[in-house]
């Protein structure tokens, strides 16, 4: 598959001081610097006869790279994959739901393995539970002047334009809710490259005391938050799973008491539930009167319960202004309901009140993908689309960019012959609506006024529902910040 520099398949020679190993897949030589007197880098040393005396093994921390066996101990001390000390804002499972093993079935078969009778019974339960719900949401498709130039830039391809339209609408909805202003902290969950915060910052121009916290659990390339060097706004990126994020422990929120605006574009499945719990339970509840029950009655390990109790006590160490809302608002574009998890779902109480439980939730979340899998591309269309994206270097390709089409992640959820495409789409939308309704009730119980609306055209994205929430009886953030 790969040969050295002497291979007839290797055109030319490696650059001076660079590895002589020819990478067949990339049609070029390895570009790693070699040690003095060596032909190959450490990773490809096995290809050189003179290196045979030293054995290379897979790194036990990350098998994607190798290391000399006789230098393993030294390597483990500096390997980038070694476990790093946990930051103060990391508290294990602080935003996790209750693990009730009695409710989780031992084995759940794929939808395709259900009998026609079992499937009909599930759909009947779904329709009964959805009675009275308004399946047609209001259109709140908006835009914002901050993105005007980008939206009209011919250099942006179709993919980039679709993302810009969504970001413009989310930004317009944030402004419409009067959440766009100075003296606050925007927490972007599932931030990715950080482009939503980027546009919020541009829209705010020179607003004072604006802080951005970008939460993402994986390392991300081509981040845009590093481009912001303004004095009036600060960007801080946290690489952490939302499940373990304690906002109360972040210095700027602990010291300055800035109202938080939770935002997100296409926050996948259970990440939405974790973000809601992070905002309205772990964070907002710590500012409530201490004679109320601290946070939620969730069974956790002793360490976590102790941390929560400490946070509740620390919440009023500084005088908090009267009528001040720790969470000024929530604006999250929903996505990927098929990735929800019963343990973390915030609407369990709503489901139970309808006579539903973990089994029904499991199948409803699987069937929710039917709402976005009806408009499948042909192989030719998909191939052409892929080629087009590769040719256009300006396209803003991101995780949910599929040109408005969605493909289910589990072929076992398909039921050819039993239901038509339109029937499946309607059932999928009902599943999404029911899951979202549980989130709505949860926010209402926590003292918020939530709403669901369409924020973009389905031709732009089939995941086009926006969840917004404002605290009840809240005064304008401009006057309370």
UniProtKB/Swiss-Prot annotation:
The modification N-acetylalanine is found at residue 2. InterPro entries: Methyltransferase_TRM13 (IPR007871), Trm13 (IPR039044), TRM13/UPF0224_CHHC_Znf_dom (IPR022776), Znf_CCCH-type_TRM13 (IPR021721). It catalyses: cytidine(4) in tRNA(Pro) + S-adenosyl-L-methionine = 2'-O-methylcytidine(4) in tRNA(Pro) + S-adenosyl-L-homocysteine + H(+); cytidine(4) in tRNA(Gly)(GCC) + S-adenosyl-L-methionine = 2'-O-methylcytidine(4) in tRNA(Gly)(GCC) + S-adenosyl-L-homocysteine + H(+); adenosine(4) in tRNA(His) + S-adenosyl-L-methionine = 2'-O-methyladenosine(4) in tRNA(His) + S-adenosyl-L-homocysteine + H(+). GO terms for biological process: tRNA methylation. Keywords: Acetylation, Coiled coil, Metal-binding, Methyltransferase, S-adenosyl-L-methionine, Transferase, tRNA processing, Zinc, Zinc-finger. Residues 381-408 are annotated as: Disordered. It comes from the Eukaryota. Its EC number is 2.1.1.225. A zinc finger (CHHC U11-48K-type) spans 56-83. It is an enzyme of class 2 (transferase). Zn(2+) binds at residues 59, 65, 75, 79. The keyword Magnesium does not apply. GO terms for molecular function: tRNA 2'-O-methyltransferase activity; tRNA methyltransferase activity; zinc ion binding. Residues 113-140 form a coiled coil. tRNA methylase which 2'-O-methylates cytidine(4) in tRNA(Pro) and tRNA(Gly)(GCC), and adenosine(4) in tRNA(His). PANTHER family: TRNA:M(4)X MODIFICATION ENZYME TRM13 HOMOLOG. Belongs to the methyltransferase TRM13 family. This is tRNA:m(4)X modification enzyme TRM13 homolog. It comes from Homo sapiens.
């Amino acid at each position: 598959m790969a040969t050295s520099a002497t291979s007839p398949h290797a055109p030319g020679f490696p650059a001076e001081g660079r590895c002589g190993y020819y990478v067949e897949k990339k049609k070029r030589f390895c570009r790693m610097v070699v040690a003095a007197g060596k032909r190959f880098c450490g990773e490809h040393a096995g290809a050189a006869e003179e290196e045979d005396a030293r054995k290379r093994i897979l790194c036990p921390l990350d098998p994607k790279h190798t290391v000399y066996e006789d230098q393993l101990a030294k390597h483990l001390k500096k390997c980038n994959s070694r476990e790093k000390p946990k930051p103060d804002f990391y508290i294990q499972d602080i935003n996790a739901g209750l693990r009730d093993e009695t409710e989780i079935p031992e084995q759940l078969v794929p939808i395709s393995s259900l009998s026609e009778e079992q499937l009909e019974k599930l759909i009947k339960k779904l329709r009964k539970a959805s009675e009275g719900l308004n399946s047609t949401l209001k259109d709140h498709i908006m835009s914002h002047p901050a993105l005007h130039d980008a939206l009209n830039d011919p250099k942006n391809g179709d993919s980039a334009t679709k993302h810009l339209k969504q970001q413009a609408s989310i930004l317009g909805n944030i402004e419409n809710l009067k959440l766009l202003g100075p003296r606050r902290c925007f927490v972007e969950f599932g931030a990715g490259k950080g482009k939503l915060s980027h546009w919020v910052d541009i829209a705010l121009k020179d607003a004072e005391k604006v802080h951005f916290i970008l939460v993402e659990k994986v390392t991300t390339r081509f981040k845009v938050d590093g481009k912001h060097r303004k004095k009036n706004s600060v960007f801080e990126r946290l690489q952490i799973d939302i499940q373990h994020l304690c906002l109360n422990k972040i210095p700027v929120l602990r010291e300055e008491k800035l109202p938080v605006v939770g935002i997100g574009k296409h926050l996948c499945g259970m990440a939405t539930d974790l973000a809601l719990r992070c905002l309205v339970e772990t964070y907002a509840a710590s500012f409530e009167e201490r004679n109320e029950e601290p946070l939620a009655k969730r069974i956790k390990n002793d360490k976590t319960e102790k941390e929560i109790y400490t946070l509740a006590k620390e919440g009023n160490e500084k005088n908090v202004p009267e009528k001040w809302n720790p969470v000024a608002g929530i604006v999250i574009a929903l996505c990927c309901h098929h990735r929800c998890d019963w343990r973390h779902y915030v609407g369990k109480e709503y489901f139970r009140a309808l006579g539903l439980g973990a089994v029904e939730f499991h199948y409803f979340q699987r069937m929710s993908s039917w709402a976005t899998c009806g408009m499948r591309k042909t192989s030719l269309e998909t191939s052409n689309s892929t080629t087009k994206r590769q040719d256009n270097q300006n396209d803003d390709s991101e995780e949910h960019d599929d040109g408005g089409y969605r493909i289910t992640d589990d072929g076992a959820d398909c039921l050819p012959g039993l239901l038509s495409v339109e029937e499946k789409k309607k059932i999928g939308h009902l599943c999404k609506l029911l899951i979202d309704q549980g989130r709505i009730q949860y926010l209402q119980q926590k003292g918020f006024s939530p709403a669901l609306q369409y924020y973009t055209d389905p031709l732009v994205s089939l995941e086009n529902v926006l969840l917004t929430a404002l605290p009840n009886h809240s005064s304008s953030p401009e006057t309370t910040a």
